[in-house]
Amino acid sequence: MGFKMGIVGLPNVGKSTLFNALTRTAAAQAANFPFCTIEPNVGEVAVPDARLFKLADLAKSKQVIPTRMTFVDIAGLVKGASKGEGLGNQFLANIREVDAIAHVLRCFEDGDVTHVEGRVDPVADAETIETELMLADIESIEKRLQNIVRKVRGGDKEAVQQERLMKAALVALEDGQPARVVNVEEEDLKAWKMLQLLTTKPVLYVCNVGEAEAAEGNDHSQEVAVMAAAQGNAHVIISAQIEEEISQLEDDEAAMFLDEMGLAEAGLDRLIQAGYDLLHLETYFTVGPKEARAWTIRQGTTAPKAAGVIHGDFEKGFIRAETIAYSDFVTLGGEQAAKESGKMRAEGKGYVVKDGDVMHFLFNT
């Protein structure tokens, strides 16, 4: 599976410019005007992974199919969004559908680009959106609690669990903390996810800096880094303008441009890696003469579940997984050599897939 990340931010912080660059499309109207993004724009990008191309080269695969990441450019919001101000209602509905939130913060100075609050203060911007999400969660819980309490009185065991979790979330939210700070036990995780609280989603702060500051960041991005560390969230420094420029270049030209800017890799690569880390994701590969393909799974996924990402029948009829570590596959020069060297393992249902595993699944139909 891939994963879906919602790109959010106050108007005119550069989020639509970033989205356009990442998806290599101009679908979003990145104009200097509040609420220019009226409906969510959805775009998929290939996840860059040099390992996949190395495997394809060794296996002489005819086709290379990377795994993909979905970005959703969600309409900008302002203070009062939880009450429907600005484009708040659309924002709140769309953000519930994503796995994580990439919160674009304006960390650049530019007198030609207006700020909805009339100042550049990324920490305050982050607090504005977090507050709106917390207020929306409070309202959602309070509305549902009335019905849950009635079910509890009627002896509904699931309702008892839901009431306990809702009240725990409400305590945190009313204390000014997002619901993600609540310590949830393993047996409560399913019910917790069903609450669909906005502030349970992991957050990645995207510091949008000027071109000259893309390599090292600036004082604004440093403030965000301190805030993110205190919250246990992640952050990444990107120049949306640079990403927009290199999205129009051929790969070799883009590499030269990045080198001139003192950047080791594109912002897209850093953003995706940060997203992977945030959601505890990893990649395994299937490789053969026909195709080399990357698949995304969550860390801790067992072999049958990983097989199910390809097709449900693979999981249902799982027998075993012939597995080669990426390093062994590459070092030894391919599948046959790895097999002859005893590096191909037969893994059963309890095997936890490791990042980079090259796998072939055997299953009953």
Task: Name every feature range the model reports, one short phrase each.
Residues 35, 49-52, 65-71, 85-99, ...:
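Amphipathic alpha-helical transducer elements in NTP-driven molecular machines
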Residues 1-114, 123, 142-143, 148:
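Conserved G1/Walker A P-loop phosphate-binding module
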Residues 2-8, 13, 19, 147-354, ...:
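C-terminal-of-GTPase-core extension/linker across diverse P-loop GTPases
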Residues 25, 51-52, 76-78, 106-112, ...:
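Conserved nucleotide-binding/hydrolysis micro-motifs of P-loop NTPases
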Residues 96, 100-103, 108-136, 140-143, ...:
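Switch/coupling subdomain of P-loop NTPase systems
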Residues 22, 84-87, 116-119, 218-222, ...:
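Short, glycine/charged-enriched secondary-structure capping and boundary segments
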Residues 26-34, 41-43, 51-54, 83, ...:
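Glycine-rich, flexible loop/turn motifs
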Residues 77-84, 118-133, 152-158, 212-213, ...:
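Flexible beta-alpha connector loops of hexameric P-loop NTPases
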